[in-house]
Amino acid sequence: MAAKIKKGDTVVVVRGKEKGKQGKVLKVYKRVKRRNKKGEPVSLAPFVIVEGVRLIKKHVKPIEGVREGGIIETEGPIDISNVMLLCPNCNKPTRVGFRIVEEGNVRRKYRYCKKCNENIDLVSEKVIKGG
């Protein structure tokens, strides 16, 4: 399944402490699988890392020849349901849909803005075998 939010998209935080902030998506984690204390697999909801949003402080040990120790500030994860794509055409936060367009023997899949109904970008392109 294609992702509604991708790396490089500009998004707006719509819920939480950081509400209203905008930033560029640095990384998208579709689904993270971890184990709990009992060793059972746990699946976490998808989340994104957004540039300049939800800055957290980490205490790091120095590694000789690599980095200095101290307190560093880095972006923390935000649940993907708490952000909306900022449409490049109408410049508003919007929900994203998918549209399939067939032209001749080529099938193209686009992401589109549900507010202004304009295509955002091409997701995939397939050549249909003629019959």
UniProtKB/Swiss-Prot annotation:
Signal peptide: none
PROSITE patterns linked to this entry: RIBOSOMAL_L24
Annotated GO biological process: translation
Highest taxon of source: Bacteria
Subunit structure: Part of the 50S ribosomal subunit.
UniProt similarity note: Belongs to the universal ribosomal protein uL24 family.
Name under which the protein is recorded: Large ribosomal subunit protein uL24
Native species: Aquifex pyrophilus
Gene label: rplX
